[in-house]
Structures are given as C-alpha cells and as structure tokens.
A protein has these predicted regions:
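N-terminal capping segment at the start of a domain
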Residues: 1-35, 348-352
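Active-site metal-coordination/substrate-binding segment of hydrolases
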Residues: 70-136, 156, 365
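Acidic, glycine-rich active-site loops and adjacent beta-strand->loop/helix elements
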Residues: 80-82, 98, 135-143, 166-170, ...
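Active-site nucleophile and cofactor-binding loops and adjacent substrate-binding regions
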Residues: 53-55, 103-107, 322-325
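Acidic-glycine-rich active-site phosphate/pyrophosphate-binding loop
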Residues: 80-95, 160, 176-187, 341-342
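Metal-dependent amide/peptide-bond hydrolase catalytic core
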Residues: 1-5, 185, 189, 193-200, ...
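A non-catalytic alpha/beta surface segment that caps or lines the substrate-entry region
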Residues: 20-23, 29-71, 91-93
Length: 380
C-alpha cells in the first residue's frame, strides 16, 4: 500500500510530470534518432539525484541504483522514441483537461511518470531489495526493432529477475504475453521502359501488386487463444506516368502471439516470393524487423509478476486487470525466458495518429500505479 508520504509526493509533483511531457514533446525522436531526448533524460536524472547514469551504444539512458557486480536486477523501462518520422518539433497544445501532440501518450507521458516515480525512491536513498535499472530506452517503435530492449537484455542477461515496461493507454491493461512479428522490405525489379515504345514489357508495380494480391488470399492459421495477422503498410515505386516501372517496393509484416503460427506465416510469405522468382521476376527480400514471441519463461515466476500487477490495479482502482498479448519492449525479455509485463502509467487515445492526446486528470493514478509496482522492491 502506498504510504501517506508517497501520496503527498504524487500530488506535489504532478506539475513536474507535465513539465517533462512538454519538454520531451518539443524534442523530435524518431526511432534510431533519440539522441536529443536521451541527453535531456540523462541531464534530468543526474540533476535529480541519480548518480550512476549513462547513455549506452543503443541510445538507452540507463540509471543503475544499488547495482553490484553480482546482485539480481529488476528493470523498469519506458521508451523515448515516437512512431513519427518528423525531425522538427510537432504541434503541441493543452487545455485544462488534456495535452495533445503526436507521441504524447505513446510513450512520452509513460516515460515522464516513470521518471518522477523513480525519483521518489532514489532521492530518499531507500534501500533496495535488489539492483534496479531505470531505463529510458530507444527504438521500441516500428523499424526500431526493439533495439533498446535487446541491448539491456544483452548487457545484463540472466541477472535480470523481472522486467517491467511502461507503455499504453489503459491503467487496467496488463500485457502478459508477446506478439511476435517479421517485417520485410520487398523490392521488385523488371525491365520497364517507355509506356508507349516499350509497351508489353513487364511493369514492376503490376508484379508487386500481384504479390500483394497473393498475400491477401492467405487464410491465417486458426488456434484457440491465438490471433495471427498480416499487413502491407507501405508501397512505393515508379518514375512517371509515361514510364513502365522498373522498380517497386513494399513494407509488409505478419504477426502472431504463437510461435507455430508465426512459422506458418513465414513459410507462406517465403513460398510466395519464391513463386514469383520462378516466373522470372527479380524479387529482393530484406528482413527489417524480427520481434520474437515469448520464450520458455518459468510460468510460476511469470504468474507471480502478473499477480503483483493485478493486485496493484485492484488495490488502487477497485477494478480487475485486463490481460492480453501485445508487441512491446517486453517481447525481448520474454523471449529470453525472463518474466516480463507491460503496464500503462497514462491514459489517452489516438496513439500513432497526429490527434494523439492524454487525460491530465489520470496522471496521478498513473503515478500511483508506477510507484506501487516500484515499492515492492524497496525495504519500506
């Protein structure tokens, strides 16, 4: 249970959370280009009592608290990147009830809440039951391919006992399993030519369209409790209206929360590409994203972690958690056999759109949940 001092701290520091959100929203951070946000977070952590802070090669801001060479570790993480490619500040506005900006909830508000929550324990130099890593991580979105989370698991590996990531828009939702995915950039090349003089030559756009049509004939595997999907998200190519296209490309993906179904999709996609090669079409396939499904996590330990989140939601909000699968930074530890969940410390809507927003009156509740989960690892 949160102490009176913790509740007072939350009430007194909501404006700090809002200030961090405003500051971060003014700093563009597409995946792989989070340098400026990372520097902001590093400076903030150091100015607020965190002594062991660094930016690693993956652009993660890693704050180590009472970490020794041997003790077990628990990770608390929220990502700095946004799904948007913009390299100039995006529009931001707020009123008494909401803030509006691309990326304001996913994951800026979650990150701000995590930062201020962690500060409570660190500034008071409270004794931890294990080593703690507070991480503002890179590359969660899109073709970031979970680079930041991968680096943390690579660097700390089997020492990590449990792993939390803050992401999402619903304080009751607990992501309990991983949705894996494979993402491809597929490029088709043909002879092309002048639209009149070379009429009859193969058109790369037509060939790519035919591949897409074949993909969309796929009947996804059916399995109880499993959802499998596919999507073509971007297509581009051609030269001009009077040119038979020599080159066209697409970005496509498939997803599933089941490893066997993910493998079924892989085989179908690869057979499709090979079939068009057999027809004399040049098809280049580049794997640009590989997010694993869950691995062999000790079920009892994962259940205990989920139960801890369920208990916090019940205690704070008098409600039951909503469990489900998703693709988050938790994919990587789960694939490595580490108990991991994703929870939200903010409430909003419109994620991945330019109309994204957060509810300001829910920031205290997000901070309560975040601090309640962290509290378990301190001797209070």
């Amino acid at each position: 249970m949160l102490t009176k001092e913790m509740l007072s701290y939350i009430a007194e520091n909501i404006e700090d959370i809002k200030r961090i959100i405003r500051d971060l929203c003014a700093i563009p951070a597409p995946s792989h280009h989070e340098e400026k946000r990372a520097e902001y977070c590093k400076a903030w952590f150091r100015a607020n009592g965190f002594e062991d802070v660094e930016i690693d090669e993956a652009l993660n801001v890693v704050c180590r608290y009472q970490v020794t060479d041997e003790n077990d570790l628990v990770v608390f993480m929220a990502h700095t990147d946004t799904v948007f490619p913009d390299t100039e500040p995006m529009p931001f506005r707020e009123d008494e009830k909401k803030m509006y900006a691309p990326g304001v909830c996913d994951d800026t508000a979650n990150l701000a809440v995590m930062m201020v929550s962690a500060r409570y324990f660190v500034q008071r130099k409270l004794r931890a039951k294990c080593g703690l890593l507070f991480v503002a991580n890179s590359c969660e979105e899109g073709l970031g391919n979970l680079k930041g989370s991968r680096r943390i698991v690579q660097d700390y590996g089997s020492r990590i006992r449990e792993f939390y990531t803050f992401d999402g828009t619903n304080l009751r939702r607990v992501v309990t399993s991983a949705v894996g995915s494979h993402r491809y950039r597929v490029t088709v090349r043909t002879e092309g030519g002048h639209s009149y003089g070379a009429f009859g030559n193969r058109n790369a756009i037509y060939c790519l369209s035919s591949i897409i049509n074949t993909i969309y004939t796929m009947k996804v595997p059916q399995k109880e409790g499993v959802k499998t999907t596919y999507n073509v998200g971007v297509i581009e190519g051609g030269t001009s209206v009077n040119t038979i296209a020599q080159e066209a490309s697409m970005l496509c993906e498939y997803r599933s929360n089941d490893r066997e179904c993910l493998e079924t999709m892989r085989v179908f996609f690869e057979k499709t590409f090979e079939a068009y090669r057999a027809m004399g079409v040049e098809v280049e396939v580049e794997l640009v994203g590989d997010r694993p499904c869950g691995g062999d996590v000790p079920q009892e330990k994962l259940d205990a972690l989920i139960a801890r989140a369920d208990s916090a939601v019940r205690e704070l909000f008098d409600a039951e958690s909503i469990h489900g699968p998703s693709s988050t930074d938790a994919n990587i530890p789960l694939a490595a056999g580490i108990p991991a969940i994703c929870v939200s410390a903010a409430v909003g809507r419109g994620c991945h759109t330019r109309q994204e927003e957060i509810d300001l009156d829910q920031l205290p509740n997000g901070a309560k949940l975040s601090m309640r989960l962290m509290q378990e690892y301190f001797e209070i």
